[in-house]
């Protein structure tokens, strides 16, 4: 499982850089794990160059061939050591890559890895809500291989659906949108607009995510106040700023002059890691510098017990609500995944024996709301309460742009990553 987590987390940073490179002044919120799982489904049925390109872009060619033989349920002791052992795990992963070849030859190996990882994350869902609405919809003219359909259900906990794009594309569109809306508890509507699907559509990959969790230490709504959020030297915005004092794991990244704070969700199964550059005249450049240097290995090091320690922290953190939709075809093509989108080159014969099947469209849509109780809770604000005199506090004042990651702690998987430029 460690090597799949590493692959997914590496893809997280590759993907984030790709979607953020053209605009430093926009909010971003994506679920790279969900997208990796979605394309893992496609990879299960891809062959030849189509498979190789997916393996390269999503780092699936770096998976260990031995891990899937290990027991599915790690001991509590091994879970508690997950964070600090991850760095060593990455070294072992890298060392084994030469023996694994350039591509994952056994496509079911990937399914085994994802089956274990998704089952492990599902096991903790009593503490939070995470719905990764991944599903393939194929034109009914292309019969789906029964073995592929069974593998998708077993490993990825979803289904492949046949619809009539050719004769009734509008009904198919409505069916897809209804399913996504139901999976996201009504938060994600109209995944596909009226012009998005037509009678030429043959295969659609649906990828939508809904997340809800409560903070381990909730913010008191009485301490939420209107405050300035500095977008840059000349521009500010008034936001609802939440405030609390308590013991949190916090550290400082010398090379970037940035703070890193861990705020846990209920029961500690998930954490939000917030990376906050020091306030400067040009907050955008400070954030861009952080985005250039951050990667999977560095985040592991920065968030390890060697860098983070529990201290009394005075936190000021803005409420924010992010919803975004990404048409991923051009983004993924720029990352090297080209053939599956090309009718003349795609080899998806593991999905359907028809040689004409190709991926028509993939859209990634996410929604997150952060407030006093966590995500997706009712917001409230009021008067600041008087604070008693307390020992020296480390200040963490997120009143300017920052990055954040939501991590599943037992597996070290990055579920979400985001940039808050303007709350």
Swiss-Prot record:
InterPro entries: Serpin_CS, Serpin_dom, Serpin_fam, Serpin_sf, Serpin_sf_1, Serpin_sf_2. Residues 63-72 have a biased composition (Basic and acidic residues). Signal peptide: none annotated. The record marks 388-389 as: Reactive bond. PROSITE patterns: SERPIN. Residues 75-106 have a biased composition (Polar residues). Keywords: Cytoplasm, Protease inhibitor, Serine protease inhibitor. Gene3D superfamilies: Alpha-1-antitrypsin, domain 1 (2.30.39.10), Antithrombin, subunit I, domain 2 (3.30.497.10). GO terms for cellular component: cornified envelope; cytoplasm; extracellular space. Pfam families: Serpin. The keyword Cytoplasm applies. It is found in: Cytoplasm. One of its GO terms (biological process) is hematopoietic progenitor cell differentiation. Residues 63-106 are annotated as: Disordered. Disulfide bonds: none annotated. One of its GO terms (molecular function) is serine-type endopeptidase inhibitor activity. Transmembrane segments: none annotated. Belongs to the serpin family. Ov-serpin subfamily. Interacts with SLFN12; as part of a pathway regulating cell differentiation. Inhibits trypsin and plasmin, but not thrombin, coagulation factor Xa, or urokinase-type plasminogen activator. May play a role in cell differentiation. This is Serpin B12.
